[in-house]
C-alpha cells in the first residue's frame, strides 16, 4: 500500500519517524512543507527517517497565502495520484488533494487550529483522549471515524533519558523563541523580559536558528537543566522528558492541561509574570522529587489505527 506522509512542521517529522520505520515502503511519498526547519530535518534524516520520494510544497501563509495554497493543492494532487493512504498532522490541503477512494487520516492535538479543521476532508480523525472537544469547532461533526489515543504525540517518538544528577552552575537552559507567523500563532505569542536570561547558560534553539543536528534536539533538551520557550510543542516534549519547562504563551491546549494535571514539570505563564518564573527557577532543583509518570504506548496505538 502506497502511503503519502505530509510533513508540515518539524514535529511532524519526529512523530512520523518511528511510524515510517515500521510501516513505510519504497512506493511512499513525502509531501514536505518548504520551511527551513523541515528542510533541515529531511536533508539530515539518514538513520532517523526512511528515504522516500519527497515533493516540496509551499507554506500557505502571508499576503499570497491563497495563491500558495492553490499551488500546493495542484502539486500535492499530482504527487498523491496513486496513493492509497494519506496521513496528515493538522495539514488539510493534502486530504483534499488525495484520491477520492483513498483513506485520509487527519491527526491533530491542536483544538484551536480551526482553519485547518474546517478545510480538512478526512475519513479518519485521530485525537488524544485529553482533547478538549468544545474548543475544536465543528471538527468532530465531520463524517469520519474518530480515534482517540491515550497520550501526547511526544510519547510516540520520545524515549526516557538519563538526566543530569545535579544542576549546572550556571544552570544550562535551552531557549526557543518563535517567529510567530504560524496560522494560529496570532494572540498566543507572549514576549518575556531579557532579564529572565541573566545568570543562565543559554543554548539557542530559536525558530530557524538552531545550528545543531535537528534530529538530536531531544538529546539536547535532556542534557539541559531546564527549558524556556514560547513553543507549546517544545515545552510539552521537555516536560515529558522530565526537564522543567517554562512556557510563556497564551495558548490553550488540552495536552497542556493534561501535563499539569499529571504532575509533569511544566510552568505556564500567559503574562510573563515573575511568580511563575520564580517557581520554574525553583523547580530546576526539585527533580529528585518528581514522581515516576506512566508512559502511554502511543506509538503502538497509532500503528494499529493506521494499519486497520
Predicted feature locations:
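Active-site and donor-binding regions of nucleotide-sugar-utilizing enzymes
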Residues: 5-23, 33-140
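Catalytic donor nucleotide-activated moiety binding site of glycosyltransferases and closely related
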Residues: 34-35, 44-49, 53-60, 175-178, ...
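Structural motif
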Residues: 84-85, 172, 225-226
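A nucleotide-sugar donor-handling region in carbohydrate enzymes
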Residues: 123-187
Amino acid at each position: 500500500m502506497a502511503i503519502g506522509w505530509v510533513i508540515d512542521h518539524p514535529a511532524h517529522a519526529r512523530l512520523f519517524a518511528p511510524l515510517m520505520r515500521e510501516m513505510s515502503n519504497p512506493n511512499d511519498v513525502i509531501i514536505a512543507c518548504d520551511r527551513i526547519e523541515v528542510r533541515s530535518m529531511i536533508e539530515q534524516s539518514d538513520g532517523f527517517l526512511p528515504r522516500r520520494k519527497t515533493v516540496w510544497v509551499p507554506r500557505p501563509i502571508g499576503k499570497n497565502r491563497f495563491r500558495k495554497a492553490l499551488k500546493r493543492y495542484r502539486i500535492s494532487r499530482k504527487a498523491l495520484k496513486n496513493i492509497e493512504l494519506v496521513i496528515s498532522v493538522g495539514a488539510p490541503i493534502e486530504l483534499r488533494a488525495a484520491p477520492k477512494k483513498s483513506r485520509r487520516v487527519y491527526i491533530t492535538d491542536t483544538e484551536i487550529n480551526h482553519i485547518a479543521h474546517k478545510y480538512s476532508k478526512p475519513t479518519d480523525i485521530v485525537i488524544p483522549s485529553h482533547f478538549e472537544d468544545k474548543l475544536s469547532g465543528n471538527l468532530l461533526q465531520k463524517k469520519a471515524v474518530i480515534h482517540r489515543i491515550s497520550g501526547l504525540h511526544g510519547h510516540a517518538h520520545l524515549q526516557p533519558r538519563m538526566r543530569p544528577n545535579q544542576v549546572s552552575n550556571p544552570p544550562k537552559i535551552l531557549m526557543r523563541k518563535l517567529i510567530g507567523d504560524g496560522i494560529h500563532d496570532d494572540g498566543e505569542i507572549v514576549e518575556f523580559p531579557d532579564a529572565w536570561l541573566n545568570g543562565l547558560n543559554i543554548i539557542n534553539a530559536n525558530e530557524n536558528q538552531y545550528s545543531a543536528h535537528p534530529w538530536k534536539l531531544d538529546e539536547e533538551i535532556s542534557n539541559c537543566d531546564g527549558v524556556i520557550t514560547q513553543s507549546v510543542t517544545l515545552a510539552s516534549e521537555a516536560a515529558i522528558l522530565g526537564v522543567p519547562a517554562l512556557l510563556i504563551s497564551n495558548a490553550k491546549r488540552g495536552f497542556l492541561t493534561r501535563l499539569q494535571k499529571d504532575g509533569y514539570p511544566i510552568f505556564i505563564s500567559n503574562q510573563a509574570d515573575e511568580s511563575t518564573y520564580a517557581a520554574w527557577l525553583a523547580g530546576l532543583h526539585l527533580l529528585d522529587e518528581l514522581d515516576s509518570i506512566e508512559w502511554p504506548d502511543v506509538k503502538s496505538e497509532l500503528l494499529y489505527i493506521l494499519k486497520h
